[in-house]
Amino acid sequence: LNISRETLQKDGQVKLIRNSLEKKIKNELHAMLVNDREKYETFWKAFGRQIKFGIYGDYGMHKDLLSDLLMFYSAKEQKLITLDEYIEKMPEGQKAIYFAAGDEAARMGKLPNAQLVLSKGYDLLLCSEDVDEFCLQIMHDYKEKEFKNINSGDLGLETEDEKKAAEETATENKDLFEEIKKALNGKIKDVKVNPTLQDHPVSLSSEGGISMEMEKILRKMPAGGEGMESTKVLELNPNHAVFGALKAAHEAGDTDKINKYA
């Protein structure tokens, strides 16, 4: 028989068989997750990457089928958890699922915004595989809880008073911020005030659809990720001594000192 691949792909019965197999395999995997956690985690460590690619590869069309099989490492519990388990333990008032992307779990947990999220009593998913962030971004949310990368934009953790104070500080130091941008010579798009940085003097975040970790991954691809760069924002802690030193240097016209800090 000479049957083309295109003919098979369009055949209604083949589609029906494929969908039936997908559901059967999914149900078997979910039963393993529920009834034999140790066995499922062994399976996940071997094949979890393929499930994530299954969600990302078809632009999220199968996310409803596969998303409850996903597992990520929990910063609070120090073990693999599902998205359902994350949501079940969310404190009242938490509106998003927070995650960090990077190479090492230990390093991610020390990031300024990671410590902020954890200090609020919220858990943090530590995503160390290159496909993780692409998968979560294409999903956008899970059970109406939006995924938020801790290093991408507003985390929604500031109080109204903190927001107002940050706006006032930014207005008062507009010229200083422009000088810092100039000193960094195009490496950042903007300078902002972030009063939630606790003991950290600065933090680097990104805006838009491409994060700093995604940029690193894209650069490793054959095309080199040409034109796929993250939009970086320097965040300053207005309550830290470094900010005070920058202000003093600006007021004194000490450009060299600002360049040194930058």
Model regions: which residues?
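Conserved GHKL (Bergerat-fold) ATPase module
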Residues: 1-262
